[in-house]
């Protein structure tokens, strides 16, 4: 019997498996199993589909237990700025602390989400990398008035991103602007020094 947890089409489809419990057997999948442990996995681009999925999980997990932490694992190249801010606002809105952990990479929008985890609960694995830069822009066209509107919106998004990163890293918005004028790539240790994370996790095998 399926547990009803559907993996979005944007995700790589992983095989389901049968799990034995005191109540019998049930069909499940890795994402559903992680969800049961209050773990959300962002392993795709940040877009409207992944944002809606993550926001729904955050809200459901809050409803299930508003006082128990949620963990978000991140391995993402980034993506849409509006989708980023939708996830960000939901992370700040829900009552549970959201712990963030970078596996692989957290680039662009995903780096902001990594930094937005609860203070003291942001981490990365030793070989993870973090990339920050100004919000990407697409080619603009149209009348002069349209271009002015688009330019103003691009500047608004950039200032919002700088303010958000400043709030979570302790860097000034001015320093964030300088650092994100071009791609800034950080190792896990570099992200720790920059204030994007609070710790670099050791491998579990080393602690056994």
From Swiss-Prot:
The active site consists of 108, 133
Citing just one GO molecular function, the answer is: serine-type endopeptidase activity
Keywords for the protein's UniProt record, in alphabetical order:
Cytoplasm, Hydrolase, Protease, Serine protease
Pfam families reported in the protein's UniProt record: CLP_protease
Protein name (Swiss-Prot/TrEMBL): ATP-dependent Clp protease proteolytic subunit 1
* Any coiled-coil regions, as ranges: none
Q: Could you state one GO cellular component term attached to this entry?
A: cytoplasm
Q: What HAMAP family does the record point to?
A: ClpP (MF_00444)
Relate the assembly described in the record. Answer: Fourteen ClpP subunits assemble into 2 heptameric rings which stack back to back to give a disk-like structure with a central cavity, resembling the structure of eukaryotic proteasomes.
Where found, per UniProt?
A: Cytoplasm
Q: Name one GO biological process term.
A: protein quality control for misfolded or incompletely synthesized proteins
Give the family this protein belongs to, as stated in its UniProt record: Belongs to the peptidase S14 family.
Q: What's the domain of life for this entry?
A: Bacteria
Q: Which InterPro entries match?
A: ClpP, ClpP/crotonase-like_dom_sf, ClpP/TepA, ClpP_His_AS, ClpP_Ser_AS
Q: Which reaction does it catalyse?
A: Hydrolysis of proteins to small peptides in the presence of ATP and magnesium. alpha-casein is the usual test substrate. In the absence of ATP, only oligopeptides shorter than five residues are hydrolyzed (such as succinyl-Leu-Tyr-|-NHMec, and Leu-Tyr-Leu-|-Tyr-Trp, in which cleavage of the -Tyr-|-Leu- and -Tyr-|-Trp bonds also occurs)
Question: Briefly, what is this protein's role?
Answer: Cleaves peptides in various proteins in a process that requires ATP hydrolysis. Has a chymotrypsin-like activity. Plays a major role in the degradation of misfolded proteins.
Assigned EC number: 3.4.21.92
| EC top class named in words | hydrolase
